[in-house]
């Protein structure tokens, strides 16, 4: 069992980490205010894997450690084709919406701070994004992750439709003679 734990740690070493937000929160009690911190962190290998985590603790370093640990447990696979996403999609989380559009090579990452961090760590180099609604960093990050998670892999779509990957991108339809 120990070797599995070691393998998982080695697997995580390749991930880059970014802190999206550190928020101080307070709980008002009869004895006064209890301060704590909430940290939102993103981890990714810049090669199609990205994760988001939230950590809460009385001290900032402990909250950061918890957030990064949670992000490593919540990693998703993102289909990246030629440095961009395969199709347009809208990610939603509460009052936040994020429009993600594929872009031509050389466009770069057109995105705000929170969305940019998620997209960069996913390994996407060319993308157009637009944040709509609430700009709360946590909800924007969750909406972006939702959009990336719901992207369809062209290879899987081609297999389901029994056509080639090129035909998926061209939008060619086969006429059935049945």
Swiss-Prot record:
One of its GO terms (molecular function) is structural constituent of ribosome. The keyword DNA-binding does not apply. GO terms for biological process: translation. Transmembrane segments: none annotated. One of its GO terms (cellular component) is small ribosomal subunit. Disulfide bonds: none annotated. InterPro entries: Ribosomal_Su5_D2-typ_SF, Ribosomal_uS5, Ribosomal_uS5_bac-type, Ribosomal_uS5_C, Ribosomal_uS5_N, Ribosomal_uS5_N_CS, Ribsml_uS5_D2-typ_fold_subgr. It comes from the Bacteria. Residues 15-78 form the S5 DRBM domain. PROSITE patterns: RIBOSOMAL_S5, S5_DSRBD. Keywords: Ribonucleoprotein, Ribosomal protein, RNA-binding, rRNA-binding. PANTHER family: MITOCHONDRIAL RIBOSOMAL PROTEIN S5. With S4 and S12 plays an important role in translational accuracy. Located at the back of the 30S subunit body where it stabilizes the conformation of the head with respect to the body. Belongs to the universal ribosomal protein uS5 family. The N-terminal domain interacts with the head of the 30S subunit; the C-terminal domain interacts with the body and contacts protein S4. The interaction surface between S4 and S5 is involved in control of translational fidelity. Part of the 30S ribosomal subunit. Contacts proteins S4 and S8. This is Small ribosomal subunit protein uS5.
């Amino acid at each position: 069992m120990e070797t599995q734990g070691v393998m998982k740690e080695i697997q995580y070493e390749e991930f880059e980490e970014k802190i999206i937000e550190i928020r101080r929160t307070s709980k008002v009690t009869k004895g006064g205010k209890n301060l704590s911190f909430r940290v939102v962190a993103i981890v990714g290998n810049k090669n199609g894997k990205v994760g988001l985590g939230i950590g809460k603790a009385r001290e900032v370093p402990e909250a950061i450690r918890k957030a990064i640990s949670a992000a490593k447990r919540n990693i998703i696979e993102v289909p990246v084709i030629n440095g961009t996403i395969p199709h347009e999609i809208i990610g939603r989380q509460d009052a936040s919406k994020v429009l993600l559009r594929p872009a031509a090579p050389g466009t770069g990452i057109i995105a705000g701070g929170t969305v940019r961090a998620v997209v960069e760590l996913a390994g996407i180099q060319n993308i157009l994004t637009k944040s709509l609604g609430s700009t709360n960093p946590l909800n924007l990050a969750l909406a972006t992750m939702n959009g990336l998670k719901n992207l369809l892999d062209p290879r899987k779509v081609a297999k389901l439709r029994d056509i080639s990957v090129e035909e998926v991108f061209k939008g060619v339809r086969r006429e059935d003679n049945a």
